[in-house]
Structure formats: C-alpha cells, structure tokens
Amino acid sequence: MAKTVAYFYDPDVGNFHYGTGHPMKPHRLSLTHSLVLHYGLYKKMIVFKPYQASQHDMCRFHSEDYIDFLQRVSPNNMQGFTKSLNAFNVGDDCPVFPGLFEFCSRYTGASLQGATLLNNKNCDIAINWAGGLHHAKKFEASGFCYVNDIVIGILELLKYHPRVLYIDIDIHHGDGVQEAFYLTDRVMTVSFHKYGNYFFPGTGDMYEVGAESGRYYCLNVPLRDGIDDQSYRHLFQPVIKQVIDFYQPTCIVLQCGADSLGCDRLGCFNLSIRGHGECVQYVKSFNIPLLVLGGGGYTVRNVARCWTYETSLLVDETISEELPYSEYFEYFAPDFTLHPDVSTRIENQNSRQYLDQIRQTVFESLKMLNHAPSVQIHDVPSDILNYERTDEPDPEERGGEDNYSRPEASNEFYDGDHDNDKESDVEI
C-alpha cells in the first residue's frame, strides 16, 4: 500500500547565513528543494510550509534562560552579551547571525509539526531536511546546532508512542539526543559515527549504554576512517534489525546527516549516495511511522543530491540519473548527475575483524534489554500545535507573518576543497 508522505519546506530557511567561511550553509536546503521540485517528487507528497516553533515549544527541552538569550541576541547587540555568549557556548562554531532565532524557529517547527502529523496518523512518513540538529544541549549550543529539534520532536511523539527509536547516520555522534534520553527506556538511541582521534564531539564510545531506567537503551557504533558502502551495510542492517526486533518501536526518527558521504568537506567516510540511501530504504522497509530529518553535510551539491535521492526512495519513485535543469544547474558541474563518484583515497580502516567485534559487542548489549518495555496508561496532553501562543509579538509590530526574508548570500555557493568563501568554485 502506498505510504502518505508529508514534506516540510520553508522558502526562507535557505536564505539564512552563518557567516563568511562557516561550513554550515543553510542554502543547501534551497538546492535540495529545487531538485525535489524539478524531479516532480512534490507530486507524490503532501507539501507543507511549516509551523514556526515558539519559545514555549523550545523550552519543552531547553532552559528558558538559553532560549530567551537566543531570541534577544543579534550581531548588533552581542557586545552586551559577553557573559551569556560564553555561558551558552555561542561564538565560533555557533555564531550569532541575523535572524538566528527565526532560523531555529523554522527548522524546529517543521520537526514538531511532522511529529504531530505522525501522532494523528495524518501521514506515514514526515520529511524535514532542515532539521536533525543533533548536537544542541539543554543549556547550550554545540556543533553548529542551537535548538535540538530532534529532542523536541521526540517529546511530542512520546505523547502517543510508548517507544520511539532514534537512528543517527551522521558522521558525528548524536550526543545531544543521547544525553536528553540517557536515563529513559521510552527512547532508544542508536548512533553510527566516526569515533577517535579527538573527532568532534568526542563522545559515542561503545560503552556509553545509558543509565538508570535507560541502561542498555543507548547504542553506539563507533567507526573508523574510510568506511565504505559494503562495510557500513555489514553493520547497519543486522544491528537495526536486531534493535527493532528487541525494542519493537512504535515510531522511528531517522537523522540522515550527509557528512558521512565520501568527499564531504568535514568528513572522512567513503559512503556513496546510494549507500547512504540504502540505510533510509532499509529503515523504511519496516513499515513503522517514520520522521526523517537532515543533519550535517558540508559539500553542498552532494548534500542536495543525497537528500533528493532519499526523498525519491521515501515516495517509491525512480528518478533519472541525469539532473533536471533548474536555476542551480551549473552548481552540479561537471557531470550534472545524481550519483557522481564521491569516493576518496582515504583507506578503509574498518577491517572485517573490527566490524565483527563491534557487531558482537552490540548484540551482547542488546541481550540485556527488556523486550519492548511497557508504559503506564496516562492521559494524552493536547497537541503542542494547539497551544495558545502567548509569547509571540503582535503581528502588526512584527511586520506580518513572513517578515524575515533575506536575499541569498552569494558566498553560500562556495564549497570547494580550499574554500574560504572568497572565491566561487562555480560560475553562477
């Protein structure tokens, strides 16, 4: 039976800009959406311009002081916030930029709305490529992430779902999500990531397994440089099958960070776009309600290819290898294809022996789980999106609902190997 797929896209979200030289480029979302449109994939989905999350929504996970700071700080007044900037880890990796709070509101609102639609059985799969910012902590920003839309989305899912499984295939450990649910068996977190050699964020060892009620409900799969499709598949599929068999989640959240692809500007893995997509296809095959989110990914043209391809898999549509003509067509030079060779010369340091050892350790850990922990019956709170908004300024003062619209920053288009945002790699 065909699945109902909800797709969230805010036309302004790609116009925010972290600043000159910063590797995180929201413009990748505009490129992705352009390909989704020109391939005609939007016809297979219900397309939403998402809800914008309020302070109240964000404070379901984050501290009020931190969210209040995000709403008030701007490039013009940040000199007066020196103490707060340090306290909340806002600075180099997580800079203050124009429209910062609104950017967070847009990507978080989409994840929250996706969770609500899944709760109400209005869709089987919800996609928010702008979300997946898995490093943000309760009291601070981290790793280009300010508000943890994943945690907020999962908290909404937990109103209706006794058990939520979180899977993370970003090259970086999903530390913010793990930390949020470390003490509970209501959420099981499974992260496949590069670990060792001081690679950010430095967490995600195999022996981080959860604590108290959450003991053994946290699973980490630490990987070494250069992992390829075959090696990744050798671990991913059996681990996920075992987790789903044991835990029996009623909903899955999948973070699809594309920095695990070969040729990523900040990555050191060797996955192809097909190999990355195979993970998405495999998780989808279990026919469990699914919230699909973006995440990392710093070679912009390949991020757009990857998430477009994965959108096609989620809607069961075969799309052409030749990219459709769009306003960003020249950006995909020189091959203009969906699946260019993204392999690198990085040696695969994940030997079969190492992978088997990890697999064995993971399976031993799973044996410690209670099968499908149950939840006491409780009243279901009203949907978060029905809450009365008391923290919004008057629309007249704001200048209308869509007051913040910025032109595309030209340096969003730069992402070459030696890119420093001073010279474009592509003629636009």
Swiss-Prot record:
Keywords: Biological rhythms, Chromatin regulator, Chromosome, Cytoplasm, Hydrolase, Metal-binding, Nucleus, Repressor, Transcription, Transcription regulation, Zinc. Its main location: nucleus. It comes from the Eukaryota. GO terms for cellular component: chromosome; cytoplasm; cytosol; nucleus; transcription repressor complex. GO terms for biological process: circadian regulation of gene expression; epigenetic regulation of gene expression; negative regulation of transcription by RNA polymerase II; regulation of circadian rhythm. InterPro entries: HDAC_PDAC, His_deacetylse, His_deacetylse_1, His_deacetylse_dom, His_deacetylse_dom_sf, Ureohydrolase_dom_sf. Residues 3-316 are annotated as: Histone deacetylase. Residues 380-428 are annotated as: Disordered. Inositol tetraphosphate (1D-myo-inositol 1,4,5,6-tetrakisphosphate) promotes the histone deacetylase activity by acting as an intermolecular glue between hdac3 and N-Cor repressor complex components. GO terms for molecular function: chromatin binding; histone deacetylase activity; histone deacetylase activity, hydrolytic mechanism; histone decrotonylase activity; metal ion binding; protein de-2-hydroxyisobutyrylase activity; protein decrotonylase activity; protein lysine deacetylase activity. Pfam families: Hist_deacetyl. It is an enzyme of class 3 (hydrolase). The keyword Cytoplasm applies. The active site is at H135. 1D-myo-inositol 1,4,5,6-tetrakisphosphate binds at H17, G21, K25, R265. Zn(2+) binds at D170, H172, D259. Its EC number is 3.5.1.98, 3.5.1.-. It is found in: Nucleus; Chromosome; Cytoplasm, Cytosol. It catalyses: N(6)-acetyl-L-lysyl-[histone] + H2O = L-lysyl-[histone] + acetate; N(6)-acetyl-L-lysyl-[protein] + H2O = L-lysyl-[protein] + acetate; N(6)-(2E)-butenoyl-L-lysyl-[protein] + H2O = (2E)-2-butenoate + L-lysyl-[protein]; N(6)-(2-hydroxyisobutanoyl)-L-lysyl-[protein] + H2O = 2-hydroxy-2-methylpropanoate + L-lysyl-[protein]. Histone deacetylase that catalyzes the deacetylation of lysine residues on the N-terminal part of the core histones (H2A, H2B, H3 and H4), and some other non-histone substrates. Histone deacetylation gives a tag for epigenetic repression and plays an important role in transcriptional regulation, cell cycle progression and developmental events. Histone deacetylases act via the formation of large multiprotein complexes, such as N-Cor repressor complex, which activate the histone deacetylase activity. Belongs to the histone deacetylase family. HD type 1 subfamily. This is Histone deacetylase 3. It comes from Xenopus laevis. The lineage of its organism: Eukaryota, Metazoa, Chordata, Craniata, Vertebrata. The gene is hdac3.
